[in-house]
């Protein structure tokens, strides 16, 4: 890996794809709060948090390690590599690109320079691991042990039961979810053989939900016979805007959205943001400064290079991973394929034919049939439940950054179909009144943002406001455990949660506590860490000038306060 300052150059060039991906990087470990005693093994499968290594045992670079690129541990004082790296990207941009409208050299060098940072984490052009990368030996050994040895606990009376954290299914989260589903089936079979049980339960989160959905698609009979219940938390099966829109041309740089995202990160303890930064972003957003700064570059350059730059960034970072392609929404899929691989018959389509075959197979087998796959599983006897989280700003550069979300995916997607308002507007009074008149009042959230009646499984979908995508609280685990292990289909009327809609008080990182939940009411539902206001967009010119002046003076006060603060 090259010098740290070259890494910084790459970091700056990849910020659009990387920045918000750091959001789920600090999932808080929790201690189990016993809720009930399951008579079947419970399999846990999570997202992309598992550390991967190469053939020499070195940790593979992960976006969660992005902060480490600023450490100058290999800095020998020689700036030649810095200049070469920058020149390799800027020269073709300025000369062949801007002067002669030939952008191919720029795309090629952009992909090459950034790809060196992510080299060992990239899959090859067939979607297979390189450099001997994969799971750590100790994870493989642990899985081998638990799959072949009964992990049951016993009560003082000798009754056998299973807790929620003994059967972790570890996997290389970059790979094709359908291939991983084959491994999951084998894991289930071995557990059944070693325990003598006839069924298991499954708790899945984030990318793990794609693996489980693929398993249900490929092995429906096996699931019907051997899976009692499936519980999803923070699902990305229907797509995740931050991964889907980033490669389908849906960019909308929004300073106010960036500010809201920073306030969220500050509130949940990811990092501290100086209030002056927030005030500055407010000023940039409310005065229209950012829009004016970007107007000319956007007009002259953006539309000419967006597809080529998207392809270069995607294939040098995260999109040789079929697992991330599984998070592309059905609506964005065709556009994303063209942005990243070019039109049918293109050179890149041929070059990446093996990878594309896996991506398209998942699309044909899973993505295009998700409602049928899940309803089919339920009809075959598999119990199913969903937790959808919200109360946070999604990726600030997403075109749909106005949707209510868990930072990663919108509620409409993670809940499999809830009708929602936006961060700017609740569902209209007319809509809510009509739904109540039609008998759906119980499905409406007290904050006026969600109608759960349109979910794929409205009776077994729960909503938690104030818990982010990266937070897996004990309160969620209680419910997930019950959904997966219960001998009957659990519903919102008979679960351990006090309501279909709950509010979560986020854990203070400095306190040894996992927070609390309570039934949502009109009094406690205002949990957002910011106020979203788009009134300026529809204001007349005079109103905009007045607001800009007020914001400008507010920023000057904040600046002087910071400069002369004692």
Task: Outline where the language-model segments fall.
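Short hydrophobic helices that act as membrane-entry/anchoring signals
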Residues: 88, 543-565
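A structural signal for short coil/turn segments at secondary-structure junctions
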Residues: 12, 195, 223, 379-380
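N-terminal non-catalytic accessory region
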Residues: 28-203, 210-265, 393, 405-406, ...
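Alpha/beta-hydrolase fold catalytic core
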Residues: 164-178, 306-402
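Alpha/beta-hydrolase-fold enzymes
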Residues: 255-350
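Alpha-helix boundary/N-cap detector
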Residues: 284, 288, 331, 350, ...
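Sec-dependent N-terminal signal peptides of Gram-positive bacterial secreted proteins and lipoproteins
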Residues: 6-27
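N-terminal secretory signal peptides that target proteins for export/translocation
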Residues: 1-4
């Amino acid at each position: 890996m090259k010098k740290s300052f070259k890494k910084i150059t790459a970091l700056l060039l990849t910020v659009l794809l990387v920045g918000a991906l750091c959001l789920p990087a600090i999932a808080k470990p929790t201690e189990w709060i016993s809720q009930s005693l399951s008579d079947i093994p419970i399999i846990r499968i999570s997202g992309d948090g598992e550390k991967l290594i190469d053939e020499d045992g070195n940790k593979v670079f992960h976006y969660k390690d992005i902060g480490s690129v600023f450490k100058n541990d290999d800095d020998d004082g020689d700036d030649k590599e810095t200049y070469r790296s920058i020149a390799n990207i800027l020269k073709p941009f300025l000369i062949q690109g801007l002067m002669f409208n030939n952008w191919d050299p720029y795309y090629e060098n952009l992909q090459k320079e950034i790809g060196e940072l992510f080299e060992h984490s990239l899959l090859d052009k067939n979607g297979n691991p390189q450099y001997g990368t994969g799971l750590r030996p100790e994870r493989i050994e642990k899985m081998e042990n638990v799959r072949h040895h009964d992990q049951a606990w016993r009560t003082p009376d000798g009754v056998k039961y299973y807790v929620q954290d003994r059967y972790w299914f570890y996997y290389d989260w970059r790979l094709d979810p359908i291939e991983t589903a084959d491994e999951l089936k084998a894991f289930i079979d071995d557990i059944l053989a070693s325990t003598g049980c006839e069924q298991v339960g499954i708790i899945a989160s984030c990318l793990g939900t794609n693996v489980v959905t693929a398993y249900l698609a490929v092995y429906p009979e096996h699931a019907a016979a051997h899976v009692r219940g499936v519980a999803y938390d923070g699902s990305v099966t229907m797509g995740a805007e931050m991964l889907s829109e980033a490669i389908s041309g849906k960019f909308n740089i929004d300073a106010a959205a960036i500010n809201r995202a920073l306030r969220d990160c500050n509130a949940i303890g990811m990092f501290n943001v100086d209030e002056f930064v927030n005030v500055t972003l407010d000023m940039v957003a409310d005065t229209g400064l950012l829009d004016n700064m970007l107007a000319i570059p956007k007009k002259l350059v953006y539309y000419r290079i967006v597809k080529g730059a998207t392809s270069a960034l995607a294939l040098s970072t995260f999109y040789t991973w079929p697992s991330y392609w599984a998070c592309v929404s059905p609506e964005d899929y065709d556009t994303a394929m063209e942005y990243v691989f070019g039109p049918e018959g293109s050179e890149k389509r041929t070059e990446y034919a093996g990878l594309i075959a896996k991506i398209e197979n998942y699309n044909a087998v899973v993505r295009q049939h998700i409602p049928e796959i899940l309803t089919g599983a339920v009809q075959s006897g598999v119990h199913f439940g969903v937790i959808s989280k919200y109360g946070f700003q999604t990726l600030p550069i997403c075109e749909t950054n106005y949707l209510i979300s868990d930072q990663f995916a919108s509620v409409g997607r993670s809940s499999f179909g809830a009708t929602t308002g936006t961060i700017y507007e609740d569902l209209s009074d007319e809509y809510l009144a009509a739904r109540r008149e039609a008998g759906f009042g119980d499905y409406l959230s007290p904050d006026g943002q969600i109608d759960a009646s349109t979910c794929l499984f409205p009776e077994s979908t729960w909503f938690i406001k104030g818990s982010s995508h990266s937070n897996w609280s004990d309160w969620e685990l209680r419910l997930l455990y019950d959904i997966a292990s219960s001998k009957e289909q659990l519903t919102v009327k008979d679960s351990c949660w006090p309501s279909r809609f709950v509010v979560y008080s986020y854990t203070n990182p400095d306190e040894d506590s996992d927070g609390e939940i309570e039934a949502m009411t009109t009094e406690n539902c205002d949990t957002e860490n910011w106020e979203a206001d788009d009134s300026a967009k529809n204001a007349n010119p005079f109103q905009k000038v007045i607001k800009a002046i007020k914001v400008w003076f507010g920023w000057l006060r904040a600046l002087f306060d910071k400069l002369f603060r004692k």
